């Protein structure tokens, strides 16, 4: 049978679509500066998927459609690195970094040496090879001589280009990491599913890259920074700083905070700056990598068998504290998982007072040998979540008590157990446990979802305990009489305010409602993708697995979770109740261009907006919002008690405005473009 002939125009369209999609991936994932809407991007991707299905002969390893995952691998091949991937020597103090500088200058016989200071990303080292500009290999560091071929998983990392912007043959190196928000989402999800959480973002990224199911890797949204060119002399590069600019030109994501330092004192100043500013970032950093800038100097300095002599890791101080376990309480999650929580003697840690720490599950307690009364070391996983890293048995008095799993649910008294023998978590098996409903309600009314401030934790507990709410939709059927039954502390004015907030919540954007439903694996970002794509909750509920998995940003694992959620008859019943109550189940899309083309950052506390609200407001008016101030920032909005962004904006001469000046600025621009400013302020929260 002869091969069928593919029309020339189809081949040309496929190639054009791939180039266009990769360009928009670069704008979105690398530059964080998209130039088309998500809907337009989806349209391009759907067309490419359609053509590749019709003509599977045209599918290539570097096609954007290969990023979504779906393959199940048998294992990972071992590959030898072309040049060893060495580790770095570490230092934690200024004296040792000054000694490093003295050694470098002595060996080079130079009075001063230029350095490049780069943030040390807490992720997984990766080597990437390209032939004629096309991705051919992604390998882990391994033992430095040999690593594992994780190419299929690397393809799911959207900031890593599958085609370079120049047709070069090259090997580069960098770090694959898990963003802070994704790490928190993943651990919350794992605890709800009864799985052990990851200890830190680095472990999460490493564990994800070694998954055999590429769809699962795609669902976890890893990211990357590239910082090293192997054999830079082949490309006419003379310094590390030139190499970073070259990597940007090729289309790689390069950390924007790297700095060229004229001497070691500028390196120390950079280290001090980021020691204080690191929490502004959406990824975890544990120090600064200091590199001699000139490659000819690097060659003179050479390396030992383990580490280069021309670079060093200048680590930030470890953020750990010692405290004591006073007691252990048990929380019941939305899916019934029982999570032990350590009640601690209050201790200062990473800028906050820590009184509680998750113990994750009873297997974790057994492995760490943690007991009530123990002295323990506590740290913040990924700089966010307090957790106990080890107990100190040497300080035991003999009065400590072992922590044993409960034999019944601490809330409803129902049976507890595991859904399957391999599960780590213990769950409440009672489908009517009020604790599950309470957690689901807290998710629904949270600020990220329907934002019903009057329905706080205590009031939700009282409503459920009184039998006034049986499922999450019952919130929208509450009456003044229901609330009055709750007794003292709920006056007429409070009742009216709560009911008004509930009424306003019915008009929230669809993505807020989707977030509030608590669908496993669906956070705020995925909720926005679903709302923009389907435009109604009922359309999402009716969507097939095949339709969902092909949507960029969804993929097979999330698609499976969504289908299973809406397959439940109870979910359908809740949707029907929401509809009858007048909750908005369709998206009202409003996009304005009042601030289009402008980049804003925000610092301090504002009077009229929370941090989440001001970001949402700016984006709805067409602005781009960034986490840190750079020369590309147009305006910094300054509230009360501003942070380090204020000083940086002054240094860079970035324009600053108060909240009042900002609103006046918006008013004038709105009027120039023919919009009613007062109407915008009244209704912007209802837009999508």
UniProtKB/Swiss-Prot annotation:
<feature type="binding site">
    <location>
        <position position="428"/>
    </location>
    <ligand>
        <name>Zn(2+)</name>
    </ligand>
</feature>
<dbReference type="InterPro" id="IPR010994">
    <property type="entry name" value="RuvA_2-like"/>
</dbReference>
<dbReference type="GO" id="GO:0003911">
    <property type="term" value="F:DNA ligase (NAD+) activity"/>
</dbReference>
<feature type="binding site">
    <location>
        <position position="412"/>
    </location>
    <ligand>
        <name>Zn(2+)</name>
    </ligand>
</feature>
<keyword id="KW-0436">Ligase</keyword>
<feature type="binding site">
    <location>
        <position position="291"/>
    </location>
    <ligand>
        <name>NAD(+)</name>
    </ligand>
</feature>
<feature type="binding site">
    <location>
        <begin position="87"/>
        <end position="88"/>
    </location>
    <ligand>
        <name>NAD(+)</name>
    </ligand>
</feature>
<dbReference type="InterPro" id="IPR013839">
    <property type="entry name" value="DNAligase_adenylation"/>
</dbReference>
<keyword id="KW-0520">NAD</keyword>
<comment type="similarity">
    <text>Belongs to the NAD-dependent DNA ligase family. LigA subfamily.</text>
</comment>
<dbReference type="InterPro" id="IPR001357">
    <property type="entry name" value="BRCT_dom"/>
</dbReference>
<protein>
    <recommendedName>
        <fullName>DNA ligase</fullName>
        <ecNumber>6.5.1.2</ecNumber>
    </recommendedName>
</protein>
<keyword id="KW-0234">DNA repair</keyword>
<feature type="binding site">
    <location>
        <position position="118"/>
    </location>
    <ligand>
        <name>NAD(+)</name>
    </ligand>
</feature>
<dbReference type="InterPro" id="IPR004150">
    <property type="entry name" value="NAD_DNA_ligase_OB"/>
</dbReference>
<dbReference type="InterPro" id="IPR041663">
    <property type="entry name" value="DisA/LigA_HHH"/>
</dbReference>
<dbReference type="InterPro" id="IPR033136">
    <property type="entry name" value="DNA_ligase_CS"/>
</dbReference>
<dbReference type="InterPro" id="IPR013840">
    <property type="entry name" value="DNAligase_N"/>
</dbReference>
<dbReference type="Pfam" id="PF01653">
    <property type="entry name" value="DNA_ligase_aden"/>
</dbReference>
<feature type="binding site">
    <location>
        <position position="141"/>
    </location>
    <ligand>
        <name>NAD(+)</name>
    </ligand>
</feature>
<keyword id="KW-0479">Metal-binding</keyword>
<feature type="binding site">
    <location>
        <begin position="38"/>
        <end position="42"/>
    </location>
    <ligand>
        <name>NAD(+)</name>
    </ligand>
</feature>
<dbReference type="Pfam" id="PF03120">
    <property type="entry name" value="DNA_ligase_OB"/>
</dbReference>
<dbReference type="GO" id="GO:0006260">
    <property type="term" value="P:DNA replication"/>
</dbReference>
<keyword id="KW-0460">Magnesium</keyword>
<feature type="binding site">
    <location>
        <position position="315"/>
    </location>
    <ligand>
        <name>NAD(+)</name>
    </ligand>
</feature>
<dbReference type="Pfam" id="PF12826">
    <property type="entry name" value="HHH_2"/>
</dbReference>
<dbReference type="GO" id="GO:0046872">
    <property type="term" value="F:metal ion binding"/>
</dbReference>
<dbReference type="GO" id="GO:0005829">
    <property type="term" value="C:cytosol"/>
</dbReference>
<dbReference type="GO" id="GO:0003677">
    <property type="term" value="F:DNA binding"/>
</dbReference>
<feature type="active site" description="N6-AMP-lysine intermediate">
    <location>
        <position position="120"/>
    </location>
</feature>
<feature type="binding site">
    <location>
        <position position="433"/>
    </location>
    <ligand>
        <name>Zn(2+)</name>
    </ligand>
</feature>
<dbReference type="InterPro" id="IPR004149">
    <property type="entry name" value="Znf_DNAligase_C4"/>
</dbReference>
<feature type="domain" description="BRCT">
    <location>
        <begin position="590"/>
        <end position="679"/>
    </location>
</feature>
<dbReference type="InterPro" id="IPR003583">
    <property type="entry name" value="Hlx-hairpin-Hlx_DNA-bd_motif"/>
</dbReference>
<feature type="binding site">
    <location>
        <position position="175"/>
    </location>
    <ligand>
        <name>NAD(+)</name>
    </ligand>
</feature>
<dbReference type="Pfam" id="PF14520">
    <property type="entry name" value="HHH_5"/>
</dbReference>
<dbReference type="InterPro" id="IPR001679">
    <property type="entry name" value="DNA_ligase"/>
</dbReference>
<dbReference type="Pfam" id="PF22745">
    <property type="entry name" value="Nlig-Ia"/>
</dbReference>
<feature type="binding site">
    <location>
        <position position="409"/>
    </location>
    <ligand>
        <name>Zn(2+)</name>
    </ligand>
</feature>
<dbReference type="Pfam" id="PF03119">
    <property type="entry name" value="DNA_ligase_ZBD"/>
</dbReference>
<keyword id="KW-0227">DNA damage</keyword>
């Amino acid at each position: 049978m002869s091969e069928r002939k593919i029309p020339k125009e189809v081949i040309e369209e496929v190639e054009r679509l791939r180039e266009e999609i990769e360009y928009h991936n670069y704008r979105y994932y690398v530059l964080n500066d998209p130039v088309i809407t998500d809907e337009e991007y989806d349209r391009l991707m759907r067309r490419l998927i359609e053509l590749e299905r019709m003509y599977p002969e045209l599918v290539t390893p570097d096609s954007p459609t290969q990023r979504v995952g779906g393959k199940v691998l048998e294992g990972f091949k071992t590959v030898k690195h072309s040049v060893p991937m060495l580790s770095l020597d570490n230092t934690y103090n200024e004296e040792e970094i000054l000694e490093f500088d003295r050694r470098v200058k002595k060996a080079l016989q130079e009075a001063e040496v230029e350095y490049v200071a780069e943030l040390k990303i807490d992720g997984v080292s990766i080597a990437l090879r390209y032939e004629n500009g096309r991705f051919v290999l992604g390998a882990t560091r391994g033992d430095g001589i040999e690593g594992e071929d994780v190419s299929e998983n690397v393809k799911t990392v959207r900031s890593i280009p599958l085609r370079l912007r120049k047709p070069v043959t090259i090997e580069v190196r960098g770090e694959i990491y898990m963003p802070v928000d994704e790490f928190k989402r993943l651990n919350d999800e794992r605890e709800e599913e009864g799985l052990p959480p990851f200890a830190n973002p680095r472990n999460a990224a490493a564990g994800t890259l070694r998954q055999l199911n590429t769809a699962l890797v795609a669902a976890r949204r890893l990211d990357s920074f590239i910082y090293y060119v192997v054999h830079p002399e082949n490309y006419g590069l003379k310094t590390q700083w030139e190499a970073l600019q070259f990597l940007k030109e090729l289309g790689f994501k390069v950390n924007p905070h790297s700095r060229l330092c004229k001497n070691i004192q500028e390196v120390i100043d950079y280290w001090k700056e980021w020691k204080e500013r690191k929490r502004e970032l959406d990824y975890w950093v544990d120090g600064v990598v200091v590199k001699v800038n000139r490659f000819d100097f690097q060659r003179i300095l050479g390396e030992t068998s383990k580490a280069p002599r021309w670079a060093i890791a200048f680590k930030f101080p470890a953020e750990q504290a010692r405290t004591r376990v006073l007691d252990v309480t048990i929380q019941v999650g939305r899916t019934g998982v029982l999570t032990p929580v350590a009640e601690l003697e209050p201790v200062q840690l990473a800028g906050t007072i820590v009184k509680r720490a998750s113990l994750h599950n009873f297997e974790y307690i057994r492995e760490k040998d943690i007991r009530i009364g123990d002295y323990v070391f506590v740290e913040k996983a990924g700089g966010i979540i307090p957790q106990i890293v080890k107990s100190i048995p040497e300080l035991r008095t003999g009065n400590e008590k072992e922590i044993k799993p409960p034999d019944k649910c601490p809330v409803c008294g129902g049976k507890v157990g595991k859904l399957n023998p391999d599960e780590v978590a213990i769950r409440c098996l009672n489908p009517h446990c009020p604790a599950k409903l309470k957690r689901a309600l807290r998710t629904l009314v949270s600020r990220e979802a329907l934002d019903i401030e009057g329905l706080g934790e205590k009031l939700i507990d009282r409503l459920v305990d009184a039998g006034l709410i049986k499922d999450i939709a019952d919130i929208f059927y509450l009456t003044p009489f229901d609330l009055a039954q709750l007794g003292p502390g709920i006056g007429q004015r409070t009742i009216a305010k709560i009911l008004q907030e509930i009424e306003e919540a019915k008009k929230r954007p669809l993505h807020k409602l989707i977030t509030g439903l608590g669908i496993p694996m669906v956070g705020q970002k995925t909720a926005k993708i679903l709302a923009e794509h389907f435009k109604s909750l009922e359309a999402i509920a009716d969507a097939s697995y095949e339709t969902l998995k092909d949507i960029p940003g969804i993929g097979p694992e999330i698609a499976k979770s969504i289908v299973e959620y809406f397959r439940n008859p109870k979910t359908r019943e809740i949707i029907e109740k929401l509809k009858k109550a007048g909750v908005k189940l369709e998206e009202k899309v409003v996009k304005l261009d009042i601030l289009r083309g402008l980049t804003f950052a925000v610092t301090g506390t504002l009077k009229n907006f929370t941090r989440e609200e001001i970001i949402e407001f700016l984006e709805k008016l067409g602005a781009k919002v960034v986490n840190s101030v750079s020369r590309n920032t147009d305006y910094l909005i300054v509230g009360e008690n501003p942070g380090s962004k204020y000083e940086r904006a002054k240094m860079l001469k970035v324009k600053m405005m108060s909240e009042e000046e900002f609103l006046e600025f918006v008013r004038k621009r709105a009027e120039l473009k023919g919009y009613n400013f007062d109407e915008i302020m009244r209704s912007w929260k209802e837009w999508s």
